[in-house]
Swiss-Prot record:
ATP binds at residues 12-17, 47, 108-111, 168-169, 200-202. The active site is at K39. It comes from the Bacteria. This is ATP-dependent dethiobiotin synthetase BioD. The gene is bioD. It is found in: Cytoplasm. Its main location: cytoplasm. Keywords: ATP-binding, Biotin biosynthesis, Cytoplasm, Ligase, Magnesium, Metal-binding, Nucleotide-binding. It comes from Gloeothece citriformis (strain PCC 7424) (Cyanothece sp. (strain PCC 7424)). Its cofactor is Mg(2+). GO terms for biological process: biotin biosynthetic process. Homodimer. Belongs to the dethiobiotin synthetase family. Pathway: Cofactor biosynthesis; biotin biosynthesis; biotin from 7,8-diaminononanoate: step 1/2.
Length: 226
């Protein structure tokens, strides 16, 4: 499957930073090949708007957000509040069609791996059932080790094809804090999952050059078809 699902341990911990960094890298170095950029499902304002702000003018990048709810809460709660249903069949069909049209698809999940998509299914269920190659974003902070262990265990429970972990610095941190909060060897030992890189703190998330540079520090051979 020519796609990568980007999920995380929680909401607001770096999925969109990784997604836009990989997209910026693709735009810079693989621009002749089409890329699909898709949000699994969106509630409230956010990712769809950022995608269009950063990449909307590039015809080689096709942006898709099949389902959107105005209420910025968990999808089943938002759907109930708005009197709507969550049509995952539509999402799957648009995802498959996007793969047919483009060389590769970056699919950004919502919330964390355990976040509900419907009243019955979580992101982990979707990743497992759709057999998506997946990367897990873990924030660099106190408690990150436990979050990584718990989420990798959840991924294994759902037989997810987890390619690795990306550590994300959402704020400026010291080398000492990085080593203390997210010791790579310990995380890899406890999870039996490779850490594919560390996204540095990016002061301007609208700077495509900085996003590209951030992506270039990662183990891209495991993330993109280079």
């Amino acid at each position: 499957m020519a796609a990568l699902l980007i999920t995380a341990t929680d909401t607001e911990v770096g999925k969109t930073v990784l997604t836009t960094s990989l997209t910026a890298y693709w735009q810079t170095y693989r621009g002749k090949k089409g890329l699909g950029l898709m949000k699994l499902l969106q509630t409230g304002v956010g990712d769809q708007e950022r995608y269009h702000q950063l990449f909307g003018a590039d015809s080689s990048i096709e942006i898709k957000v099949p389902l959107w709810f105005k209420t910025p809460v968990a999808p089943p709660v938002a759907a109930a509040a708005e009197g709507k249903t969550i049509d995952l069949k539509r999402v799957w069909q648009e995802f498959c069609a996007l793969q047919q049209r483009q060389s590769f698809v970056l699919l950004e999940a919502l919330g964390g791996l355990g976040s509900p998509v419907t009243e019955e299914l979580t992101v982990a269920d979707i990743a497992g059932q759709w057999r998506l190659e997946t990367v897990l974003v873990v924030p660099v902070k106190l408690g990150a080790i436990a979050q990584a262990v718990a989420n990798v265990a959840l991924a294994r429970q759902h037989q997810i094809k987890l390619k690795g972990i990306i550590l994300n610095c959402s704020q400026p941190i010291s080398e000492e804090q990085l080593k203390d909060w997210t010791p790579i060897n310990l995380i890899q030992s406890l999870t039996s999952t490779p850490v594919l890189g560390i996204l540095p703190y990016i002061s301007d998330l609208n700077d495509l050059e900085k996003l590209t540079q951030a992506a270039s520090t990662l183990d891209l051979e495991k993330l993109l078809p280079l």
